[in-house]
Amino acid sequence: MKTSIAIVDYGMGNLRSVAQALKKAEPAADVAIVDTPAAIRAADRVVLPGQGAMPDCMRCLGESGLQEAVVEASRTKPLLGVCVGEQMLFDWSAEGDTKGLGLLPGKVVRFELDGRLQDDGSRFKVPQMGWNRVRQSRAHALWDGVPDDAYFYFVHSYYVMPDDPAHTVGETAYGAPFTSAVARDNIFATQFHPEKSAEVGLRLYRNFVHWKP
């Protein structure tokens, strides 16, 4: 029986890119972009994407009528958050003083890099845009076959700060180390975009399809 994956369509996020990457990573999976609570509840696995500003993402999720179904899914089935979808899982964001879903304890803060210089003498830019390494700070099934310190693609000005360090499974350096991947129980989430991260991103998506938390 095919594994069904629901990509939550609440009006924010690069849904088609995520869907195409998941289908390429695991052609046997049944991948669908969904916009009803019933479709989220019926799926075996759920992906919460997000891009842009967290206040807009939280508002759109609330107005979509899908928020309760996403919270339910976080308790009962594998859930993957991507980019702002990761940030939304936390309690609060400094971006617009925004309340998150509260599924993971912690907050979201902005890079404070004014005047800081990189090794080549250029200034750090916010947002961080481009490839950067992810150090696997804790073993996890979604890292299977993904080399430690592999490059993933980032586009963001804010990052998560989990209250519990044990929830951090990936770290990246940009001015200073920050949490770039988190996990707890059946939840896994990344600040980077696996769908924009070539083969290592596809491997992570394939691992998600087969993950049995």
Swiss-Prot record:
Pathway(s) annotated for this protein in UniProt: Amino-acid biosynthesis; L-histidine biosynthesis; L-histidine from 5-phospho-alpha-D-ribose 1-diphosphate: step 5/9
Molecular function terms from GO: glutaminase activity; imidazoleglycerol-phosphate synthase activity; lyase activity
Chief place where the protein resides: cytoplasm
Record keywords: Amino-acid biosynthesis, Cytoplasm, Glutamine amidotransferase, Histidine biosynthesis, Hydrolase, Lyase
A GO CC term attached to the entry: cytoplasm
Residues in Glutamine amidotransferase type-1 domain copies: 4-213
Subcellular location: Cytoplasm
Domain of life: Bacteria
Annotated catalysed reactions: 5-[(5-phospho-1-deoxy-D-ribulos-1-ylimino)methylamino]-1-(5-phospho-beta-D-ribosyl)imidazole-4-carboxamide + L-glutamine = D-erythro-1-(imidazol-4-yl)glycerol 3-phosphate + 5-amino-1-(5-phospho-beta-D-ribosyl)imidazole-4-carboxamide + L-glutamate + H(+); L-glutamine + H2O = L-glutamate + NH4(+)
SUPFAM superfamilies: Class I glutamine amidotransferase-like
Pfam families to which the protein is assigned, alphabetical: GATase
GO terms classed as biological process: L-histidine biosynthetic process
Annotated function: IGPS catalyzes the conversion of PRFAR and glutamine to IGP, AICAR and glutamate. The HisH subunit catalyzes the hydrolysis of glutamine to glutamate and ammonia as part of the synthesis of IGP and AICAR. The resulting ammonia molecule is channeled to the active site of HisF.
Protein name from the UniProt record: Imidazole glycerol phosphate synthase subunit HisH
Organism (species): Burkholderia multivorans (strain ATCC 17616 / 249)
